[in-house]
Amino acid sequence: KRIVPTEINENNSLIKGYVHDENAYKLGGVAGHAGLFSTTNDLATFSQMMLNGGIYRWKRIFKPETVALFTSRANVIGGSSRCYGWDSPSGKASGGVYISDDSFGHTGFTGTSLWIDKENEVIVILLTNAVHPKRESKSPTYFEWGQRIHSAAYESLNLKEKNENLDWRKNW
């Protein structure tokens, strides 16, 4: 009941609470790349646990080595900014222009994004739905909106000057 509708599918049915990703659908509806349904409160809790190196409310959830593995560049594909399940800052990162080099994040097809900045202890969560009511309504600038919102969060925390000259931004 707390999940918003995703989109109207090709059968003219409103999808709500089910993964709408075609690849996940072909894999039985559940896959590691799509279909996270959550709230900002739950994502903030999870993000704080990741920021704490795997601990939340004095309970260890993940080993520090696991968090480090999840959030370090995998380099499976040379030059990739991908971690195991996350992305890291590079080029035009969805986390905006002020995230530190010690950050990791993830985006979703519907325009959602989550970035966790370990250096600055900042978490920015954006839950949106750029494909509602139909994915054809998805604006090509939705990615830019996410960048602007993440950047505005850093500006509001007076972190703009601290991070505006990081090396990876030279290609921005």
Can you say where each PLM-predicted feature lies in the sequence?
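Glycine-centered small-residue hotspots that permit tight backbone geometry or close packing
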Residues: 17, 108-111
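Short, gly/Ser/Thr-rich active-site loops of penicillin-recognizing serine hydrolases
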Residues: 52-56, 65-66, 71-74, 134-172
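Short, glycine/acidic-rich beta->alpha junctions
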Residues: 28, 106-108
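Short, surface-exposed beta-strand/loop micro-motifs that present aromatic residues
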Residues: 103, 110-123
